[in-house]
Every structure is written in structure tokens, then in C-alpha cells.
Amino acid sequence: MHAHDDGTAGSLSDIGARDHSITAEYRIFGPPGTGKTTNLTRQIRRAVERFGADSVLVTSFSRAAAAELAGRDLPIDPDRLGTLHSHCYHALGGPEIAECHVDEWNKDNPHLQMTPKKKHGRLDGEDAGEDEGSERGKEGDECLEQLSRWRGMMIPPEGWPAVVREFSGRWREYKDAHGLLDFCDLIEVALRDVYVAPKHPSVIFADEAQDLNRMQLTLIRKWGERASYFIVAADDDQTIYSFTGATPEAVLDPDIPADHKIILKQSYRVPRAVHGPAMRLIKQVTRRQEKDYLPRPAEGECIRLSSGTYKSPEYFIVKTALQHLERGQTVMFLAACGYMLQPLVAVLRKNAIPFHNPYRKSNGFWNPLRMGRGSTPSRILALLVAHPGFGNGRRDWTNSDLGLWAEWLTSEGVLKRGAKKKLPNYPPNDSATIGTLDGLFETAALEALLTTFEGDYRSLLEWWRKRVTASVFKRVQFPLDIADAHGPTALIDVPRVVVGTIHSVKGGEADVVYLFPDLSGEADRQYQKTGPPRDAVIRQFYVGLTRARECVYICQPESSSRVAI
């Protein structure tokens, strides 16, 4: 992986060794698939060798990126690796977080209610960067997001809309009265009061820096001035969290000497046929770091579908996707907004095609096969594990298994009176004997259950499907269909289809990408303008295109509200 080496741009081996009289900042620009994480890992190891394991601080926008770096077996303590919010939270002594304590606010402000956040989720960057056009929470959530955006861009209050200023005053009063800091305060107070980065590092690394807003990058740079040097790893072309206040300018300004900029130019993901349209698209933006960026040496394909829109994905789109899945390829379906994926999800469910979104595990709509104690797939596996057709790993039921799948059965005609109350009292790890079953089930239901063991495992699935309670009937259909069509292990196997918004899969890749070019009304208004609003839309679709390793399908737009790709 080579950077520019033409005498102007810097090279990876020079990091930390250049003249620091102007700045100690280095920037690594990593276009899609160029191995930014690999290079950053190498730089962290170099810094540890030079300064020691206690002299390095690594920060990233999200916990997912921090975890990816941590997974590279870095020679630093886990508490030196985390999101910027997490580092600030600990540096400020672990204050109470306002977004986690909104009960009083919701009582006093019924028209501006907020959804309480989980502290660790937000500190880990989990809900930062939810998609534009996604289903927002309550009215107060929207107001707080707007306020945080204006603050993050470091625009003085007199430049804010009046409604944001008014909300800001009430929110500040609430925080002061209850001794709380919100997530934006963590950065703002650290910028004001914490002069040196936590643990006094000699070298600071900021990954995913294009996702940080001006205030966050100002803090990194303030801390960086007191380090020997610091590295900002980013791709300004992938700045797509504009709704959190992230802008390319925050990364690109102030300018730094050319020999402090390193550009990773060789993509190991994007083939020529995808690279061409992606570059034509991104070159339309008004502000970017010019990059010499090369496709991987493979032709690939860019196919424009003549029919099949997000509202009618069944035939051309899903049929071709099935052909790719049969060849063992991974497939990703991407749209600008969550609502555009609803018809597709309905078709995937109807056809029993397993799908997930590993980048947004908290979204149940995109992850209907999530495992976990009490989840539908775990109950179905607990049911099937004793059947001779289960295959490897077949074993007799334990009382714990029995409790999982029997809990959702309807009582009438199936379970004896009081059976559900008995279930939790059985020792969970003991085998469920025929005597146990006889004590729980009505005779006819038990006979039908035992008969299923003489046939295919699907007959056991059908026995359960017909007897679950009405309250869970709808919920169990898709996982049951998956097990029926593909076998029990399909509930455990990682699905080869990913469904999500472009925002949700940033950093991800698949062999084949289906990209819906449609825009919401708001995004279309942005796209029709010039400058930053239009640029934000273009960058979003550039990110969508460049997830593809082999082939991208540009689907038919549903209307004229679309991006020209």
C-alpha cells in the first residue's frame, strides 16, 4: 500500500519525522478499500515501539471502528482506545449524562419529549450518525439533534434558527438544575477545561475523522499540539454524517504542508467498472482533497436495471440477487432512506431469504434473525435440537430448552392447567424426560408431538407453528420459514444478504451491491441546490457505490427524485 511518493505528498515511513514547526498534524487519506485500518494499525505499532505502550491514545468516531482496531491485537491498553466521547467522559470524571436522565424533562415538557438513551451506547457512538430520512424519535430528539449540530459546527448562538435558540435555553436550564452534561457538553467542556489528552500521550490517532464535527476535531487538534505528533485518518469524500455537523472543511482546514499528507491510492475492493462511475460522481463536489485513487486490477460490472424500483423489487431485483447467492456471493441492498427498503424486506421475507445488517444490530427490522436468549431463532433451535433431523449437535431436550419453546405455546388443547407456571421450577440443565412432557402436555398434543420425531424435522416445525399463541404468531413466521427452507443451521449461519441505508453500512462491503438512486423530498431539494447541500447527497451515493467488490446494480428510480449516477 503505497502513498504518493512524488516529492510533494508525504509517505507513511515519514510520519512523525517531518518538520513540526508549522504543525504536528499528519493526515492519512484512505479512499474506499485502500486499507486505512491496516495502515493505521501499522502506525500505532510504530508509535508504541518509539514512545512506549503508555504513550499512545487512539480515538475513533464509533465503537465499531475502535473494535476493529482493537481486533488487530494492538499493543496498547484497552482504556487508551475508544470513542472521543468516551475519552472525554472519563477525563471529566464520569458525569451524569442528560440524555440518559430525561424523565423529569418529559414530565415538564410534554410537547418536547425525548427518548432516554443508554449511556454506553451513546458513548460508544452507536446512535450517532443515524440516517437522514430514518424514522426519527420524539419531537425533543429532533430538537436536541439540531442543537447538537449547530453547536458541533461551532456556530455562535446568534447564527442559529430562533427555535433552536429557544430550545437551547430550556435544555440548558434543565441540565444546570439537575447537574447534568449532554453528549455535546462532553466535547465542549473538554475543549474548554482539559488541556492535555487523557493519560498525556506522545502520539494521538483519530480514526474516521471525516465523521467528526468541527468542535470534535478542534479538540483533537488542541490535544495534538501537546503531543509529539498526531495523525488524523479520514476520507473527506466519505463525509456523510452532515446532519451531525460533520463537514469536509472540518477535516481539510486548516491546510497543512503537503509532506504531512499521505494518500493511500490503491483500492483492494473497487473494480474498474465501479470505480469509473464513482469517480465521475465524486468529482462533482465543490470541495475535496484531490487524490490519485486506483481501482483494483479487475474489470467488475456496473449494470443499470431497466426495470425494478424500490417499490417493486420482486422480479428483476430479487431474482438476479438469488442467482448471485447461488454462486456463493454476498449481496447488499442500499437506499438513501429506511422507508425505501420496506418493500424489499417484505419480498425477502416472503421468499425466505435470510438477511441482516451487522452494522446496525440494534435495528430489529433489518435483523429479524438476531440470536439471544428468548429470541425467536433461539426458541426454534431449542425445539429442533432434539429431532433426529437436526444433524450435528443433536441432543435430548433440557428443561431449559423445553421452557424456551413451550412458553410460546397456546394453553388450550395443548398444555395442562398450570403447566406454564411449572416450567420455571424445573432444574434448567436436567434432561426433559417423557415423564416431564407427560406432566405438561394434553395427551393428544403430546402424541402429535412425539409422532413428528418419526418424520422430517419440518413436521416438528409445523406442529409448533400451529400451536403458538396469537401474540407471537406473526413474529415466528419468518424464522420458521428460514428453518423450513434452508435447515436449522440457517438460523445460526451469517446471512449473505445485507439490507440497510447507505449511512448504516459505511465501512462495509459486499461482492454485489444493489443501489436504489431515489431521494426523499428533502434530499431532492438539497440535490437541486449547488454547493454543500448538493455535495452531501453526492458523497452519500459515492459511499454506496464503493461498497461493491465485484458488481453494482443501479436500480430504476421510482420517480424523478433521484441522483444521476
Question: For the regions a protein language model found, what residue spans apply to each?
Answer:
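Conserved interdomain hinge at the start of the Helicase C-terminal
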Residues: 308-329
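Conserved helicase motor core of SF1/SF2 NTP-dependent helicases
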Residues: 28-34, 38, 61-64, 203-206, ...
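Core RecA-like ATPase module of SF1/SF2 helicases and allied nucleic-acid translocases
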Residues: 34, 63, 86, 272-275, ...
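ATP-hydrolysis module of ASCE/P-loop NTPase motor domains
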Residues: 96-176, 393-432
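P-loop NTPase Walker
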Residues: 1-97, 500, 505-506, 543-546
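Conserved two-lobed SF2 helicase motor
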Residues: 83, 182-186, 190, 495-503
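Conserved P-loop NTPase-based nucleic-acid remodeling module centered on helicase motor cores
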Residues: 55, 60-143, 351, 357-363
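Accessory N-terminal region flanking or inserted into the helicase ATPase core
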Residues: 2-30, 38-39, 55, 122-205, ...
